[in-house]
Amino acid sequence: MDGDCSSLLPAVCLVLADPKQTPPDDTSLEKLLDWFKDLHSQSNGQVLLEHQPCLLEFISSVCASKATDPAILSFTLKLTGLLAASKQDFHLLEEGGHLVCVFEREAWSVCDLWEDASVRSGWIQGLLNMLKHQQALDFICRQGLIKVILQLQNDRSLFVACLANQLLVQILKLLTPSDVTSGSDAVVSSKSSSSLDWVSVSSEITNAVVEALSSENHPQVLQGVQLLSLVLSQCEEPIRSSLWKDVLPPLEVLINRGSEPLTQPLMTVLRAAVMTPLLGQSEYKVEEFLEVMLGTGNRKEGILCATLIVKLEKCPKVLKRKAMDIILLPLQCVSTQSQDEKEVDLVLKEPLSQKALCISLLVQSLSSLAELAHKEYFEGVCIPSVTSRVVQLLRVCSGHCTSSLLHVSACTHLIGSCKIQRCGLDTLGALSVYEDNLDLRKDIFGVLLDYLKSPDSHATVLKKTFQAVLRWIGVCASFPDLLQFISNDLFPVLEKRMCDVRWEVRDSTLEFITQLTVALSDNSGFVEVLYTSGLVSILLSLLSDTEGYVRASAVTAVGEAVTSSVQQMALVSKINLLEEALAQMMIILSQDTEGFPRRAVVKTFTSWLKGSNPITALDSSLSSVLSLGGNDFDWEVKMHTLELAEALMEKMLTCCPYAVQSFSSSERTRLTQSLSKLKDLGLFDVLLNGLFDCDRPVCEKSCQLLLKLKRLNAEKADFDHDALVLKACGNRWGDEVQSRFLNKQQVKASEHVLIGGGEGTEKDLHCIKEIPLSVILQILDLDDMQRMLKLSSDHVVNSPRSLMEDILSAAQQSEENIVDCY
């Protein structure tokens, strides 16, 4: 604790303990607690209460007062527990009787303070904070606080009840294996009285869980189930198996009862159980419970349970197969022909006849299939059959429903259902990982093309369709008929979608074209098809779209089109594309009123610059891009401009890495030429302007790049520094640098006079019009600036000292207001 905080703390404690004072807001109290947590973690064995006795006085004062505000009492409870987390401070608090005083619930009940939920939650959090060692657990046992905690487990405040569960789990975690056996009946391994207390505690908690699970009161059952889940996931053996064995009878009753409101909580219990050694031991019935859950509750929960089972590593294959059948069942029902009626489960007939239930079941089935689309999860399943059913379902949703389908009534519910269409498309895309499906590619591309062509397709459905098409094109890239499909079928549809009246569709189409171009950039045939299709001219026209998002996506798409043509050495014949693209992008960067398109332009230039194939036509535009981007009012545009500057530095200074080293004569010449070119491009002005920008991320990035330059300009680099002279006047950074430069000159001049060197020359103190870059980098304390920039913006405002000063200031203002009233 620093000296300022140490001197302020006693006064703060007096203010907080004074019931006449209005307590600080909850946020301030929580920040104060966070500070104490930091002190505790950095204590290095020091006893905080010995150095700050005012804390003991504060705790005593709050305990003695009958008019304490609930917020202050809650704070005191948490603080006491936090202090008691240290063994030394725990002994001091216990010897002084403070622990009993603070955590004695009866005292707060008399004052009706216990009725406030914040006091009850503070009481639990205080115990949670303290429960870091066995002495704390021993204190809880001796004081009989377990009963209170178990009562709070059923508190009317859900927050308090959840905290009580967490506290009970923490208590069980502190019961070491030497204290409790793995059997149902605990056996004491030590004859100490404290061990006896701990064993009785574990039995008391176990009995409470059994009682809760056996209760007819739903909230009580729910809390018992939640505690069981926490114990299974957080506690070790033998506590875990001991508790499971005791709760097995009531848990079995609950699972067999099939209560729908409890299906999800019970699934959480089983999900935790399967992650433990309980799975695979028949006496614990975990697998048996999973099988029961497959057939109980609603079908949606059954599919969730089935998904969990399929993903289990240690699970009987028979159970996994049954689970997979349950997942596939809804899909199988709606896509089965009437002559195959025997194949389907007629239990689903009623749910499928109701629109809401039908859609819900299919969504869950499809989502599970998409999640499980990995080879090890689909063992023994005919993948092409599943894929065909998904294709059939997507056709039904788009209105192609044949009378031969078994559940024609269910099919009518699905026509135009965006939920089913989106889930079906996700599933179809996920199934692309299976080579067995490649023979179905014509059917798959056929249904996807139908969705792209359909005027009824929702914008979100089209986006999902594009994603699925991209995945299937990725796995079918080696097939010779793919380019024919793209040229004859896909591109004509894309042309129409690029002119769609809905801007979301135009945007999604452009994103798809960008991704497709990246995916097939190595395919010379695709690049040729792209340029002969007429899509490129539409891309260029969309650079002036009315919607900013679309313009931004068009910029990215054009950028990738140029990149792909350069990679295939096709730009020579398409030089007009680059010229027109550059012209329109410069207009966007200089005139567009929305930030997204301007950001996209700078990012595209950076992408071009980083490309493996140089685009010499960019050189004439780089200076303008740096100037416009560096002076943009959008901070993200400035950040992207700095990334462009970094790419330029990397590209032009590759022969001279950012490290202090000795250079040969030819290397020095190349370095000087490269730095001179960067200066001519205005890169140094961008970095220096960014250093004094109002947006901190921009300052940080500029500082980082200038530090690289500073290391490069170190004395050992030994090149002509005078060749890099920057104009200080007329630049935003000039005033700041000149001010620092002249201050240093004045200091030197005054020192010169003091040692008798004559009068300082007045001309040295005049406004400097030009300053060498090396001098600028020396003037600026970049290391210190970087350190300050890395601090959070609120490191001063939210410091402990500032917080305590605010508390004292508010208290003083309150007293002055009282005096004014008189």
Swiss-Prot record:
A Gene Ontology cellular-component term: nucleus
Keyword terms, alphabetized: Cytoplasm, DNA damage, Metal-binding, Nucleus, Repeat, Zinc
- Tell whether Manganese is among the UniProt keywords: no
> What SUPFAM superfamilies does the record point to?
ARM repeat
Task: Please tell me where this protein is predominantly located.
Answer: nucleus
Q: Which GO terms describe its biological process?
A: cell population proliferation; DNA damage response; integrator complex assembly; positive regulation of protein phosphorylation; protein localization to nucleus; response to ionizing radiation
Give the transmembrane ranges.
Answer: none
- InterPro entries hit by this protein: ARM-like (IPR011989), ARM-type_fold (IPR016024), BRAT1 (IPR038904)
Q: Which GO terms describe its molecular function?
A: ribonuclease inhibitor activity
Segments annotated as HEAT repeats: 490-528, 535-573
* Locus of motif BRAT1-like motif: 820-822
The UniProt function text for this chain reads: Component of a multiprotein complex required for the assembly of the RNA endonuclease module of the integrator complex. Associates with ints9 and ints11 in the cytoplasm and blocks the active site of ints11 to inhibit the endonuclease activity of ints11 before formation of the full integrator complex. Following dissociation of wdr73 of the complex, brat1 facilitates the nuclear import of the ints9-ints11 heterodimer. In the nucleus, ints4 is integrated to the ints9-ints11 heterodimer and brat1 is released from the mature RNA endonuclease module by inositol hexakisphosphate (InsP6).
Could you say which protein family the record assigns here? Belongs to the BRAT1 family.
Domain comment quoted from the record: The BRAT1-like motif mediates inhibition of the endonuclease activity of INTS11 by forming hyrogen bond and hydrophobic interactions with the active site of INTS11: Cys-821 coordinates one of the two active site zinc ions of INTS11.
Q: Matching PANTHER family, A to Z?
A: BRCA1-ASSOCIATED ATM ACTIVATOR 1
Query: What name has this protein been given in UniProt?
Result: Integrator complex assembly factor BRAT1
Q: Which organism is it from?
A: Danio rerio (Zebrafish)
> What is the phylogenetic placement of the source species in the record?
Eukaryota, Metazoa, Chordata, Craniata, Vertebrata
